[in-house]
Amino acid sequence: MLNADLKQQLQQLLELMEGDVEFVASLGSDDKSNELKELLNEIAEMSAHITITEKSLKRTPSFSVNRPGEETGITFAGIPLGHEFNSLVLAILQVSGRAPKEKQSIIDQIKGLEGPFHFETFVSLTCQKCPDVVQALNLMSVINPNITHTMIDGAVFREESENIMAVPAVFLDGQEFGNGRMTVQDILTKLGSTQDASEFNDKDPYDVLIVGGGPASGSAAIYTARKGLRTGIVADRIGGQVNDTAGIENFITVKETTGSEFSSNLAEHIAQYDIDTMTGIRATNIEKTDSAIRVTLENDAVLESKTVIISTGASWRKLNIPGEDRLINKGVAFCPHCDGPLFENKDVAVIGGGNSGVEAAIDLAGIVKHVTLFEYASELKADSVLQERLRSLPNVDIKTSAKTTEVIGDDYVTGISYEDMTTGESQVVNLDGIFVQIGLVPNTSWLQNAVELNERGEVMINRDNATNVPGIFAAGDVTDQKNKQIIISMGAGANAALNAFDYIIRN
């Protein structure tokens, strides 16, 4: 089941185990159970620290990752391959006693939860966002005996996941808890536990404080650290929006990679330098005083710095039509790689005729029954090679000059209405899902009246990546820079860093 390269990598990782692990498997006579049994046997044969026993669990096929004689609360329902294979390997190592790579303050927060909390997360194995949530909840289960977590592959347990239209979908004690990517800190916050502000207030002022965690942020941080400046990063997550990107093929010298791999490599590169990286928390305000630039965090802590580089990136742009907000995660989705498998053999729409929209339609056409692509303009804007591929697919319709006007449905999406711009007629297409791919909106809501923004809400910068406020710079997709590309953002981050350094030595 595992190829030779994966086995070799796994063998090296299993050598890091610090104790014994027991797979407790619930297996039947079905094909999926046989596949799971084969996977578990392959893994167990690679380490003397791993044993397998069989026992009836809540779901079949499934298995728990326990210590001998001790339940950890970690269960995988289905076969954790694809993006979830890393979640399994990490669970094995942590259950064996390998210390988690998490700040002690976060570990203390997890230990302080009283519980009991029983989490279940529905995933798809092609989902880029799901492993973050699965790994966060598995970690919490390892640390706190009052927490349990089960990963559920929606493709295996279709009856349970029938009404799940966006993953990851997290349930706590049977009630919906959250959707989409969540960090450990996000989960702790939703449970009412917040990071102690004193942990941040006691920090010495920085030379450069970078707000955001994407490519521009990483580039800026490395450049300023190499200049010997005291550098800090405050971000929700390292990698930013890139984490949600499936394939990257235009980052020069790297022929092909994924968003998650890119983000992991970025985090490793940042860690090689003396950079104070604060993740799982967001900035809520910024102001320049006579003595410093002050950045307020969501826990009301305040950080001070001589200069600040804003690189908070952008988020998916919404249609802003009736029914959309109400039916997000109920058929309205933004990530075809994550949520596409949930619409197998169903009819869906893709909104947007740029590269992202056409790529999404091509990918979805291989999964769903039928795709209708809507584009507001009179022609598609995607690269010609993508358009040719799209038009060759038999289960795709293209509607140009189409203005979407309403998402239809009560509890779930049942259709979309649009206006034909050439005739003025309103029409309805019955379908089950809508994937919105109309670009990004800058994450600048926290910057109102702090720095100058343009009509699109982007931070306005000059050739030095400086804003209108001395000492405050900006880089990446959050700015009014025309082209939004990873490689351009990294160059912008470096430019902002070098000009922040120049500002410091001149002031």
UniProtKB/Swiss-Prot annotation:
Cystine connections: 335-338
Residues annotated as binding FAD: 207-222, 467-477
Cofactor annotation remark: Binds 1 FAD per subunit.
Signal peptide annotation: none
Required cofactor(s): FAD
Residues where NAD(+) binds: 347-361
EC number: 1.8.1.-
Gene Ontology terms, MF aspect: flavin adenine dinucleotide binding; NAD binding; NADH-dependent peroxiredoxin activity; oxidoreductase activity, acting on a sulfur group of donors, NAD(P) as acceptor
Lipid metabolism among keywords: no
UniProt superkingdom: Bacteria
UniProt cross-references to Pfam families, sorted A to Z: Pyr_redox_2, Thioredoxin_3
SUPFAM superfamilies, per database record: FAD/NAD(P)-binding domain, Thioredoxin-like
Keywords of this entry: Disulfide bond, FAD, Flavoprotein, NAD, NADP, Oxidoreductase, Redox-active center
More about this protein: The active site is a redox-active disulfide bond.
Family membership: Belongs to the class-II pyridine nucleotide-disulfide oxidoreductase family.
Binding partners and assembly: Homodimer.
The protein's name: Alkyl hydroperoxide reductase subunit F
Lineage: Bacteria, Bacillati, Bacillota, Bacilli, Bacillales
Encoding gene (name): ahpF
